[in-house]
Swiss-Prot record:
One Pfam family recorded for the sequence: Coprogen_oxidas
Source organism (scientific name): Drosophila melanogaster
GO BP, sorted A to Z: heme biosynthetic process; protoporphyrinogen IX biosynthetic process
Family of this protein: Belongs to the aerobic coproporphyrinogen-III oxidase family.
Lineage per the UniProt record: Eukaryota, Metazoa, Ecdysozoa, Arthropoda, Hexapoda
This protein's name: Oxygen-dependent coproporphyrinogen-III oxidase
Classification via PROSITE patterns: COPROGEN_OXIDASE
Highest taxon, organism lineage: Eukaryota
Catalytic activity: coproporphyrinogen III + O2 + 2 H(+) = protoporphyrinogen IX + 2 CO2 + 2 H2O
Active site location: H195 (proton donor)
EC number: 1.3.3.3
PANTHER family per record: COPROPORPHYRINOGEN III OXIDASE, MITOCHONDRIAL, OXYGEN-DEPENDENT COPROPORPHYRINOGEN-III OXIDASE, MITOCHONDRIAL
This protein's pathway: Porphyrin-containing compound metabolism; protoporphyrin-IX biosynthesis; protoporphyrinogen-IX from coproporphyrinogen-III (O2 route): step 1/1
Amino acid sequence: MNALRHTISLVSLGTFQLVRRTRGPHARGFLLGTGLGLASFSAVTYAHSAEAVDPKVNGVQMNTSRFMAEPITDSKALLGDKENMRHRMEILIMEIQAEFCRALEAEENCGQKFKVDRWERPEGGGGITCVLQDGDVFEKAGVNISVVTGSLPPAAVQQMRARGKNLKEGASLPFFASGVSAVIHPRNPHVPTIHFNYRYFEVETAKGEKQWWFGGGTDLTPYYLCEKDASHFHQTLKSACDEHDPTYYPRFKKWCDDYFRIKHRNESRGIGGIFFDDIDSPNQEAAFNFVSSCARAVIPSYVPLVRKHKNREYGNNERQWQLLRRGRYVEFNLIYDRGTKFGLYTPGARYESILMSLPLHARWEYMHEPKSQSEEGKLMKVLKNPKDWV
């Protein structure tokens, strides 16, 4: 029996509401009371029956055991229309979620595992939340996918119009969104935090026309600067971009530097990476392949850094600095992050889930300023003035 541990909380695109638990015909469960950081929740463990068989369509079997849970869309539908971009994106994000979760679990020294929650949304779709908390390597890690449909509220439509989308003002429009999103907060201050998000969006206009686009990015937030790590991270992302267009990396690197700027502090959240949105060219197939390459570059860009630093010694000073920088992370997410804003605009959104990207612990000190020649000061110079790493 393969036990899947389910925990209610979602790091998502910031748009989705948890409504009810999924109980398949081969599932049984029990409730556990627990708590997670800023949110309280219950955990459910399901043991899937050994008699459960992956569905077949035209003799082809989908091996769902490689995923963290059953797909959101019925497996027969996924196999029956594999050329549908909605289905292709769902399979991709399921794969990315499972591969990344297992790569992180392999770095835990004491065998800590992700808890998994598969949830549904009555308006359409659902998601899979994977949470690893209080590990010896990862203090808090969330890796999540969402596949949802619904109607965009007018405020969200207005936000998209501001980005140049040709949508009718004041309308409530049907949409489809799918994506994988992760924020990893390590325990050791010498291991950086990583965030990535890759998504696909469709919206139907008042005239019945369908608009689609991809978005996403991967960025790194170190607490102590290691230039070799920064170069490795950026070079890995650049290689993924260069497979498709040599102009992508410099464009999306600058976009990332601009987007993750904490304007009221005049500093960056981290050392950047790549960031892009509204990608709908040169065609849907090419855009999907580009997003796939970027998503698959996450593990080789990040896991070697975890392995390199996870067992390094550190003291209270390093820990306090890590908490101060996490305070900056909180400031950005609550004030500037587009996904958080989008979620807060969405009626009925599960706000604990939207805020789950926040770290377990953060710190603010009045007028804190590190010495310029200290290791902390070296990081601040780069955060004040982003640089090229490759």
